C-alpha cells in the first residue's frame, strides 16, 4: 500500500458545493487524509472559505467579498460560506491545507493565523500558494509548514527556498514525472500535486512516487491507493 497523502480539493466538489462544511465532511468520510480550503478576508477581517474574490460563481451574488462584512456574507448565502473557525471545528483532528489566493503581505495573513492559533489548530494546518503569499506566511510564523506552489519545471532559486523554507513543492500535476519527483526528493523536499481527477492520471502520479495528491475525486484516489 502506498502512503501518499490524499488531499480533498475544496472538499468533495463533484457532490457538494465547494468550500462548504458539508463538502469538507463528505471528503473526510470518503477517505481524505486532509482537506484543502481557500481563504479570503471579509471587509471586517474575518477569514472565510471562498476561492473567488466575489460571491457570483458559487452563490449568485455579484458582490466582492472585500466589500461585505462577515454578517452580510452569512445573510447573502444563508450561512453557506463558513468561517475559518467553523471549518476547523468541523474537520476535528484532520489536516487542513490552507490556500491563500488573496494574501499578498503579512498584514493579510495575520488574521488567518490568529484564528488558527485561537482554535488550537496550528499543528494540523499547513499553507500553500505562490512565492509572494508564502513569504508573508514565513514572515508571520517561522514555524509554519509550507507547500510552495511552483508552476515551472525549473527549480526554485536557492535564495527563494532559503527565505520560504518550504517542506513541500506543490506542482500542477501535468508537470510531474519520476525524474522531477526524484530531483525534489534529492533536494530534501516533498512533492505535492494538484489536481488530477482521473484514475489514469492518479495512477501515473502514484507510480512517479509523489508524496501528496490534491484532487476533486478523493474517493477515487483513496480506492486506488488501497489496492
Q: Language-model features: where?
A:
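Phosphate-group recognition and catalysis centered on beta-loop-alpha active-site segments
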Residues: 1-227
Amino acid at each position: 500500500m502506498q502512503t501518499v497523502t490524499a488531499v480533498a480539493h475544496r472538499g468533495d466538489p463533484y457532490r457538494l458545493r465547494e468550500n462548504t462544511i458539508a463538502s469538507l465532511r463528505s471528503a473526510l468520510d470518503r477517505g481524505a487524509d486532509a482537506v484543502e480550503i481557500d481563504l479570503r478576508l471579509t471587509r471586517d477581517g474575518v477569514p472565510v472559505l471562498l476561492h473567488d474574490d466575489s460571491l457570483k460563481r458559487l452563490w449568485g451574488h455579484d458582490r466582492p467579498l472585500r466589500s461585505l462584512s462577515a454578517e452580510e456574507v452569512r445573510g447573502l448565502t444563508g450561512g453557506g460560506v463558513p468561517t475559518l473557525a467553523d471549518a476547523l471545528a468541523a474537520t476535528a483532528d484532520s489536516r487542513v491545507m490552507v490556500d491563500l489566493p488573496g494574501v499578498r503581505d503579512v498584514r493579510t495573513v495575520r488574521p488567518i493565523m490568529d484564528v488558527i492559533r485561537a482554535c488550537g489548530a496550528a499543528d494540523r494546518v499547513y499553507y500553500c500558494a505562490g512565492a509572494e503569499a508564502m513569504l508573508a506566511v514565513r514572515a508571520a510564523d517561522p514555524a509554519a509548514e509550507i507547500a510552495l506552489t511552483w508552476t515551472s519545471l525549473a527549480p526554485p532559486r536557492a535564495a527563494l527556498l532559503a527565505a520560504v523554507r518550504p517542506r513541500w513543492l506543490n506542482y500542477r500535476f501535468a508537470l510531474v514525472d519520476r525524474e522531477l519527483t526524484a530531483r525534489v526528493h534529492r533536494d530534501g523536499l516533498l512533492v505535492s500535486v494538484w489536481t488530477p481527477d482521473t484514475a489514469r492520471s492518479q495512477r501515473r502520479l502514484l507510480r512517479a512516487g509523489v508524496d501528496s495528491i490534491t484532487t476533486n475525486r478523493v474517493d477515487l484516489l483513496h480506492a486506488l491507493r488501497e489496492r
